[in-house]
Amino acid sequence: MPGMMEKGPELLGKSRSANGGAKSPAGGGGSSANGGLHFSEPESGCSSDDEHGDVGMRVGAEYQARIPEFDPGATKYTDKDNGGMLVWSPYHSIPDAKLDEYIAIAKEKHGYNVEQALGMLFWHKHNIEKSLADLPNFTPFPDEWTVEDKVLFEQAFSFHGKSFHRIQQMLPDKTIASLVKYYYSWKKTRSRTSLMDRQARKLANRHNQGDSDDDVEEAHPMDGNDSDYDPKKEAKREGNADQPVQTSKIGLGRREYQSLQHRHHSQRSKCRPPKGMYLTQEDVVAVSCSPNAANTILRQLDMELISLKRQVQNAKQVNSALKQKMEGGIEEFKPPEAQTPQAPRTLGPSPPAPSSTPTPTVPIATLNQPPPLLRPTLPAAPALHRQPPPLQQQARFIQPRPTLNQPPPPLIRPANSMPPRLNPRPVLTTVGGQQPPSLIGIQTDSQPSLH
């Protein structure tokens, strides 16, 4: 209480004067019990105090805070106060090698991240066997982006751009929806340099601490060479000595503009590896950790390459052997055919098989004819223009050409006085000197049908 009174004597004086002004008949001022004089404020100040309420300090036991007795058990940690859940607590009996092996199995076989794998182990009270048996019973939440996933996404985006189908080939455990969602969050918060570039820059800054001096020289390019001394320039520099800050600002502005240009066209100035080659942070760190590490890694890669070549050669040998077997054919795998004697085929009618039902009799003329598909197509009515017999055709080409006064041979002599035709009709000889009937009088219905 004395401390509060020491801090605000003016406040106490104002409150007392306000209370005393209402009771005293003078209203202008009065003497207090302590003997000090208190002057009343104008009415405007009193009205402002009335608006904000009574500002006086309240004294008494009813206005003091009640502090309970000290209880050491009440300050213990409770889960209800924080609302969080403990997911991992290290245990001294588990060696680090065994723990790393458990985490690797959980990540590679079951898709857990490190936090989920350790949470499962802590749930089973650091029993690795029970945790490994219980890992397949749960599906981990796949929307977690580890550092490896982020680096792979940056590499894939630098190679393929916004082709999320190609990016998914490098991140097969991520869906296209999750890739698009991460792309927009990464686009807003990303810096123009990738994680690998930042890590390489940190390592370079640790080894080379002279980069800051180079930056200072770039920021002040006019403070460079002593050999480029020019008295006129020096006089101008002395005349403009009152503006050193502006020149430095201009230089910094140019650098910022160049950096902005580099940020907007960062893809052009990047040195990309060839297609099919990818860099990872672990490999770069492993190569740069010691001078002999690069040779050992290259030897391991050579051994892996040789083993892969051997596998390819073995596959080629197996394929060539299979091709040779295929060229031999499948004759040896065919089942043997039954050697049954076959009856000779006859063109005549086959003997009728004994049957109880009577079979219709087929004329012999139709059996001796060829099948319908092999029969020649003949016109329905006999043709008026017939070909001459073969003897007459041969005689036409064998006999010598007649002279002008020699009559034609009797075989091709026309029956009437009409000029000779190119294809004369054959002369049919009949028994008894009877003339053959004309072609018009032949009845086609009496002839058997060839069809």
Curated annotation (Swiss-Prot):
There is a cross-link at K76, K249 (Glycyl lysine isopeptide (Lys-Gly) (interchain with G-Cter in SUMO2)). GO terms for molecular function: enzyme binding. It holds the Pfam family Myb_DNA-binding. SMART domains: ELM2, SANT. Keywords: Coiled coil, Isopeptide bond, Methylation, Nucleus, Phosphoprotein, Repressor, Transcription, Transcription regulation, Ubl conjugation. It is found in: Nucleus. Its main location: nucleus. Residues 431-451 have a biased composition (Polar residues). Residues 55-139 form the ELM2 domain. Residues 140-191 form the SANT domain. Residues 375-384 have a biased composition (Low complexity). The modification Asymmetric dimethylarginine is found at R401, R413. Residues 218-240 have a biased composition (Basic and acidic residues). One of its GO terms (cellular component) is nucleus. It comes from the Eukaryota. Residues 349-361 have a biased composition (Pro residues). Residues 1-55, 204-275, 333-451 are annotated as: Disordered. Residues 261-273 have a biased composition (Basic residues). Residues 293-329 form a coiled coil. The modification Phosphoserine is found at S212, S227. Belongs to the CoREST family. May act as a component of a corepressor complex that represses transcription. This is REST corepressor 3.
